[in-house]
């Protein structure tokens, strides 16, 4: 049998022939269709190539940001500065870290993956959800391209906010809180997520960004444990919370056992829940009898009786500074260790 008439057209990409389109038929008749098919295939290849380039660029940018906040910069600062310039960031600009926890974001993404039964579409939906959050954040900084935003895993995102070193500490802090509130409100309104934010301090040199990130993470973790989610916490406002973060859990447990818990192996309380709540209200009202009584809606004499009971049970006298500090620390530790009763 003889060869059938037809045409073969080369498929080109980046000035290289990577394939051939073959169409059977009279050349004069099929040639126009061949050109259309050739053009369509080459356009599809170009789109796929550009998509991969964009994905690679995003991945390169994310890798750089993660190295920056984790302090993995290698032994050559100049090389790291060059990496930053390649992805569009001047990391010599002073910045402070804001770490955001988006309540149940990870749970939402897991549910999305399960809904798609682990298919490729589920992963695409997950990436789209992350990108939506980042676009919402980046939309706030549309006029300031040197602000850095990234997803860091779990429920968390980070913003590395540029700052003006001419600002006083007070002015800088107010600006950061205003920016944090704007981010929190925007995400809450547009995406219906509850957001908690931790803010770090400014530190010099390129390694200072990772220090600020760690502080912002600590502010977020400690603030959420002690005061609850949905607020903004600065590392310098943690008070004794910063100290608690440095004390081992076992040491905290031992301290509570000597003050408000009776035995080592369980949490049967020396003082009951009512007394603990009364004690917390007393501290929250700066040891004011009248304000505390008003806050918890009890008579002054009832409050005084409860405070005497605390002394009788624990052996600690709230009129003595050292004893009051011990009880205050024990209550803070109780909340920090996971009790949500007082939040």
Where are these regions (language model features)?
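Juxtadomain coupling helices with adjacent low-complexity linkers
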Residues: 25-83
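Cytosolic nucleotide-utilizing catalytic cores of signal-transduction proteins
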Residues: 79-97, 101-343
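Short beta-strand-to-loop transition segments that serve as allosteric relay/switch motifs
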Residues: 19-28, 162-165, 200
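N-terminal functional module of multi-domain proteins
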Residues: 16-19, 25-30, 93, 144-146
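Generic detector of intrinsically disordered, low-complexity, polar/charged segments
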Residues: 3, 16-19, 195-197, 236
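A short beta-strand signature within small-molecule sensing/ligand-binding domains used
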Residues: 1-12, 19-22
